[in-house]
Amino acid sequence: MFDIGVNLTSSQFSRDHDEVVARARAAGVHGMLLTGTNLPESQQAQRMASHYSGCWSTAGVHPHDGSSWSPAVAEAIYTLAREPQVVAIGECGLDFNRNFSTPQEQEAAFSAQLALAAELAMPVFLHCRDAHDRFLALLKPWLEKIPGAVLHCFTGSRSEVQECLDLGLFIGITGWVCDERRGLELRELLPAIPAERLLLETDAPYLLPRDLKPRPASRRNEPAYLPHILASVASWRGEETQWLEAQTDANVRTLFGIDVNGV
């Protein structure tokens, strides 16, 4: 079982990294992709990935931090991305929900990271919120030049997921799908995602599955809860949990080049 989205650099994990990783392993999560969202956190994620076996990382700048993009940051991300633990560029994309960075800053950072991924022949770890059309417009010209892409934490519509699938994207599903208030539409479109394009993630410490029992007192999500998401998704798709686990592990190997069975 592989969690493609763990924010282990979050301050919520600052006191118990070792315990979080140990609990994940005990739960059967044998691999994790640690997300980089700006230069310092990308550097920290790479250090953590080199410290913990079965962990890899991304290197990039989240749209919220698009204003931080500069030639110096680009050079540092380029250098970091060549470390063996780094297997994707990102988290990059567009987020027009709150615009912590202006749309123009976000678009510049996103386009630059797509160019970087093409130059390095690396897949991209993508973020899109309230920006679907513009996101795809910027992404499309690069898709033939990069080896693959996953739209992480997908929460969009049926038409949006179909557009992404038509472009060859992998789709990342989180515990959002376990939310009986906000996740029902996503739950209904799960069968529309081909098994060979599906990836699973917790996005920990965020998006604790609402139907998890018992719920942790901290309300903090952890990669140890990925088996709950896996079992839920398999049930709603009408598939055996063990089969879907093997398929999503194979998808990780396909997209990121990670030897999942060697972990």
From Swiss-Prot:
Please provide the record's keywords in A-Z order. Answer: Cytoplasm, Exonuclease, Hydrolase, Magnesium, Metal-binding, Nuclease
Required co-factor(s) are: Mg(2+)
The keyword Cytoplasm appears for this protein:
yes
Annotated a divalent metal cation binding lies at 91, 127, 152
* Listed EC numbers: 3.1.11.-, 3.1.13.-
One Pfam family of this chain: TatD_DNase
Q: Which GO terms describe its molecular function?
A: 3'-5'-RNA exonuclease activity; magnesium ion binding; single-stranded DNA 3'-5' DNA exonuclease activity
Compartments, record wording: Cytoplasm
Q: Which HAMAP family does UniProt cross-reference here? A: TatD_exonuclease
Q: How does it assemble?
A: Monomer.
Kindly provide the name given to this protein in its UniProt entry: 3'-5' ssDNA/RNA exonuclease TatD
Source organism of this protein record = Klebsiella pneumoniae (strain 342)
Q: What is the lineage of its organism?
A: Bacteria, Pseudomonadati, Pseudomonadota, Gammaproteobacteria, Enterobacterales
